[in-house]
């Protein structure tokens, strides 16, 4: 049987909101597989989708640069080890160099960008500051109109590309994406695999109702439709005017959303947590 650690139980609790014993039991039954434990819990308890894996725990900033004619824009993420360094003017100057290079070269290839003198600057900054600095990723969008939005703390940045429309509309939609975090532009972008997995979970939940098969099928179809609407940008209520769907707002402007990119600092990265009390206790014993 797989060993179930306290950190595994803690992560499952944070992602599901369920109690410690329930999470531990689910992990034991899933032989330590957190994703399988979540799927089993959803089937058995009707729990909503869990939070995404990979808590945001790395520091750093995101930055964007948009062309004067709003035809293209770039976004980059640069990580530091601490929030203190993420506010350092030397670090922020380096971030400016990175986003500037990506913009000038119209490139999202981090490895290629670093070969243009940025790697030497990064190494010098690491020596000066005493923390590891990492240029994690970059993206570029180009279209009729490209808008960008950076949240005030420089931890969330969005690019959105439109056919038609204008810069103000693009920025409003980018702000919405930052706030609501849709996973797809349209339900048509959701893979059959994702839908099939959700359908399996919803059917397992609905089967527990004891209702006839045709009623269960209708229940599942309704839940799938709601799920797709919640994760699709065009079907979400616009954050600045909840009475209007984003898709209707875009259509009224004679525009079309063709692409979006949303960066949040550290998403998918988890720094090693150090239990200082345990570390000290171990040293005292040793």
Swiss-Prot record:
It comes from the Bacteria. GO terms for cellular component: cytoplasm. CDD domains: UBA_EF-Ts. Residues 82-85 are annotated as: Involved in Mg(2+) ion dislocation from EF-Tu. The keyword Ribosomal protein does not apply. The gene is tsf. Belongs to the EF-Ts family. Associates with the EF-Tu.GDP complex and induces the exchange of GDP to GTP. It remains bound to the aminoacyl-tRNA.EF-Tu.GTP complex up to the GTP hydrolysis stage on the ribosome. Keywords: Cytoplasm, Elongation factor, Protein biosynthesis. Pfam families: EF_TS (PF00889). GO terms for molecular function: translation elongation factor activity. Its main location: cytoplasm. InterPro entries: EF-Ts_dimer_sf, Transl_elong_EFTs/EF1B, Transl_elong_EFTs/EF1B_dimer, Transl_elong_Ts_CS, UBA-like_sf. It is found in: Cytoplasm. This is Elongation factor Ts.
């Amino acid at each position: 049987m797989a060993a179930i650690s306290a950190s595994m139980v803690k992560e499952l609790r944070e992602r599901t909101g369920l109690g410690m014993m329930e999470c531990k039991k689910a992990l034991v039954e899933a032989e330590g597989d957190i994703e399988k434990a979540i799927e089993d819990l959803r089937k058995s308890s009707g729990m909503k989708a869990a939070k995404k894996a990979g808590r945001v725990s790395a520091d750093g900033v995101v930055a964007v640069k948009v062309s004067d004619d709003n035809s293209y824009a770039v976004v980059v993420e640069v990580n530091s080890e601490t929030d203190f360094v993420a506010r350092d003017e030397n670090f922020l100057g380096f971030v400016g160099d990175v986003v500037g290079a990506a913009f000038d070269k119209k490139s999202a290839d981090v490895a290629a960008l670093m070969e243009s003198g940025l790697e030497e600057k990064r190494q010098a900054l690491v020596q000066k500051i005493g923390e590891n600095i990492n240029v994690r990723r970059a993206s570029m969008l180009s279209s009729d109109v490209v808008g960008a939005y950076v949240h005030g703390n420089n931890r969330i940045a969005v690019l959105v590309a439109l056919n038609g429309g204008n810069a103000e509309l693009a920025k409003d939609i980018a702000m919405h994406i930052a706030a609501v975090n849709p996973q797809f532009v349209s339900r048509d972008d959701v893979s059959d695999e994702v839908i099939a997995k959700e359908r399996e979970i919803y059917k397992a939940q609905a089967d527990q109702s004891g209702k006839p098969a045709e009623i269960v099928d209708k229940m599942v179809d309704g839940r799938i439709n709601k799920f797709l609407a919640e994760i699709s940008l065009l079907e979400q209520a616009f954050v600045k005017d909840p009475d209007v769907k984003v898709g209707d707002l875009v259509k009224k402007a004679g525009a079309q959303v063709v692409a979006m990119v949303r960066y949040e600092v550290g998403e998918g990265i988890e720094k090693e947590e150090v239990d200082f009390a345990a570390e000290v206790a171990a040293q005292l014993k040793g």
